[in-house]
């Protein structure tokens, strides 16, 4: 799913999601299911402030439709604020970031892989973990441990 900025959304218990968003220092909480903070207090709501930030236009469908492919990138979202692709790998792959002027984030959703950057630094990344590459990284070698599925995001 892709919800543009200004859309009211809620995340249910037990969901594993990647919430990729544009840079912002503001989050408005308009309802909090009566949850309590660590001290037992209900968290502050921002109902009045949120009224000016909500995008009230209606979309028919927020699903991100794509055709799943193995061993090649599949574009999910490209907007003015970020681009996100999904990789479903059963084979090793080298990713070229030499033309990209941005940091890159990989979020491993399934399986695991070892990533090695162009400086020779290697890190194993497992499902539920993420890794941030500096904008100076020009190439990343992904060595799959059987299978790895991850999101790639950059600005």
Language-model-derived ranges and their functions:
Residues 1-2, 117-137:
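Short acidic-glycine-tyrosine-enriched beta hairpin
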Residues 2, 10, 19, 83-86, ...:
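Structured core elements
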Residues 6-26, 135-155:
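Ligand-binding loop in jelly-roll beta-barrel domains
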Residues 7, 93, 101, 129, ...:
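Surface-exposed loop/turn positions
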Residues 14-16, 22-25, 29-40, 106, ...:
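Non-heme Fe(II)/2-oxoglutarate
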Residues 27-100:
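C-terminal amphipathic alpha-helical segment
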Residues 87, 105, 111, 128, ...:
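Hydrophobic, well-ordered secondary-structure elements that form the walls
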Residues 90-119:
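Glycine- and acidic-residue-biased ligand/ion/polar-headgroup-sensing regions
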